[in-house]
């Protein structure tokens, strides 16, 4: 049984912690999550497994960009490898995105690298904007002239609909209305959003 207080303490103290790894968020996006835990929650790795037709597999839940190993200290390639090899053998297929601080050996033929772009928001907007390339600045100007803007008051149902109508229509296992409703209800309840 996962001690969620200890888990969340680990994520809070991790140099690479993210919202995706907090227990409350994992409970929303994949209520059956499990974990690899080193010692007394020094390092942790959420496991997002399911079973279909008697075959266990790990997958990347919707609305979770990345997971991986979370630690208070920088992880070596060997330490990351130890966690990967500790994933239970019952998982016959694994599709799981490690966070950017989980460096792995390029020699592993079962690992595929994907591009991941993150924008560091520690700096003020003007500093960030000044460091954009010309193409990004041009695209921002087009968006502004088209009347596109940031909306902070969006309902969770709208986020779910945007996902379903765009990315979700290409994802075969995103057609279960009960899962969509549960995710929406959980986001409304846990994130303090409200319904119209």
How should these model regions be labeled?
Residues 49-111:
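Acyl-donor binding region in acyl/amide transferases
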Residues 1-54, 98-196:
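A conserved beta-strand-loop-helix scaffold within acyl/acetyltransferase catalytic domains
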């Amino acid at each position: 049984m996962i001690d969620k207080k200890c888990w969340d303490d680990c994520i809070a103290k991790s140099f690479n912690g993210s919202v995706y790894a907090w227990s409350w968020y994992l409970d929303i996006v994949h209520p059956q999550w499990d974990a690899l835990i080193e010692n007394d929650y020094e390092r942790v790795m959420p496991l997002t497994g399911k079973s279909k037709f008697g075959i266990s597999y790990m997958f990347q839940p919707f609305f979770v960009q990345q997971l991986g190993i979370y630690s208070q200290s920088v992880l070596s390639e060997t330490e990351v490898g130890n966690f990967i090899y500790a994933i239970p053998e019952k998982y016959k297929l694994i599709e799981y995105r490690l966070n950017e601080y989980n460096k792995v050996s390029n020699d592993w033929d079962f690992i595929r690298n994907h591009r991941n772009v993150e924008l560091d928001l520690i700096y003020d907007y003007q500093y960030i904007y000044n460091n954009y390339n010309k193409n990004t600045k041009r695209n921002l100007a087009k968006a502004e002239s088209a009347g596109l803007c940031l909306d902070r008051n969006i309902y969770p149902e709208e986020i779910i609909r945007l996902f379903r109508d765009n990315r979700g229509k290409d994802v075969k296992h995103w057609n279960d209305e009960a899962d969509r409703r549960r995710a929406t209800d959980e986001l409304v309840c846990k994130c303090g959003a409200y319904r119209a």
